Design a protein with these regions (language model features):
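Short acidic/polar alpha-helix capping motifs at helix-coil junctions
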Residues: 12-16, 119, 147, 209-213, ...
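Primarily NTPase-proximal linker/entry elements flanking Walker-type ATP/GTP-binding cores
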Residues: 18, 23-147, 152-188, 192-197
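Intrinsic disorder/low-structure terminal segments
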Residues: 6-8, 27, 125, 298, ...
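Generic intrinsically disordered, low-complexity segments enriched for polar/acidic and small residues
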Residues: 4-6, 43, 130, 296, ...
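Short glycine-rich anion-binding loops that position phosphate/pyrophosphate groups of nucleotides
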Residues: 200-202
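N-terminal accessory targeting/assembly segments
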Residues: 1-29
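C-terminal accessory "lid"/substrate-recognition subdomains
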Residues: 2, 315-316
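Conserved catalytic-core segment of NTP-binding enzymes
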Residues: 175-190, 204-315
Length: 316
């Protein structure tokens, strides 16, 4: 295992985050930094900053909130230069994204349910999570709970092989809750630390989704009363604000506890990371920064802003 760094992950993760955020850092966020650097702080600057935050896919309401917080910080601390304002904005953004709690992974086993519409990178995210936790020394088992799509189980099985973890699957059309029940029971009996479960990516309406997921959550507790349960929703960073709007209903119905944001390396905007917690009320737990199996990394607000908005070194 690699030693963990200052922000809860090692140098490898830090480098991956740096590379994965290259487009975002040099794109809109680069122009935000250029706007602030060398500027005097006045209303024009705030207006321009608000506009650029919206272009960076932060969303209107979040952009206004960030700029208002910056105005307050500038006044409170008597900041004079754009460089000082940039450092202050960096801290405000990190605060905005900070989760209130850690992930609940203390159960026997710890169960992570992964949900999301088809096409966002759900299956690959599950394999990458399995790889990540295996590298942390955990014994991981996968549950092929997306039984509505024949290809889903096969795809997950291939990825499970790459991650070197066992998988429990059933025939097409089997009840997802039953597959997940069998997996959790088997994992508990065999001393596995964690079960990561796939779920259907298309359910026709909200009540179907709620029924399916509450069945799954009951089956987890029935299979192993000491299990803990996290439900992570996978979102595609490239579709940004659209993804967040679509996810609102899904989150409520699914009782999600956190977000996996994929394809962050494929967008120059990347501001939707900042908007997710504000708009969905859920913390980002992992970000996808590439195609490789080890390209899903734990998200930390400090690590993120460190790479996105390098400190100018000005005191404030």
């Amino acid at each position: 295992r690699e030693p963990m760094g200052l922000f809860g992950f090692g140098k490898k993760e830090k480098d991956k985050m740096k590379d994965g955020l290259e487009k975002t850092r040099t794109g809109f966020w680069g122009s935000i930094m250029n706007t602030l650097t060398g500027s005097k702080i006045d209303d024009d600057l705030y207006d321009e900053l608000e506009e650029q935050l919206i272009l960076a896919d932060v969303g209107g309401d979040v952009a206004i909130k960030l700029v208002d917080a910056l105005r307050d910080r500038v006044q409170e601390k008597g900041l004079k230069t754009g460089e000082q304002a940039a450092d202050a904005l960096r801290d405000i953004i990190a605060d905005e994204m900070r989760p209130e709690t850690e992930m609940a992974l203390d159960g026997h086993p710890a169960v992570i349910l992964v949900i999301g519409v088809n096409g966002v990178g759900k299956t690959t995210s599950i394999a990458k999570l399995a790889d990540y936790y295996t590298r942390q020394g955990k014994k991981v088992m996968l549950a092929a709970g997306d039984t509505f799509r024949a290809a889903a189980s096969e795809q997950l099985e291939i990825w499970a092989g790459r991650a070197g973890v066992p998988i429990v699957k059933a025939g097409e059309g089997a009840a997802p809750a039953a597959v997940i029940f069998d997996t959790v029971k088997s994992a508990a009996a065999r001393g596995y630390d964690m079960v990561i479960a796939d779920t259907a990516g298309r359910l026709h309406n909200k009540s179907n989704l709620m029924n399916e997921l509450s069945k799954i959550s009951r089956s987890v507790k029935k299979a192993a009363p000491e299990a803990s349960l996290e439900t992570l929703l996978v979102l595609d960073a490239i579709t940004g604000q659209n993804a967040i709007s679509q996810a609102k209903e899904f989150c409520k119905a699914a009782d999600a506890t956190g977000i996996i944001l994929t394809k962050l390396d494929g967008t120059a905007k990347g501001g939707c990371v900042v908007a997710v917690k504000q708009r969905l009320g859920l913390p980002v737990r992992f970000i996808g920064v590439g195609e490789g199996i080890d390209d899903l990394i734990p998200f930390t607000p400090e690590g993120f802003v460190e790479e996105l908005i390098p400190r100018t070194g000005w005191k404030h």
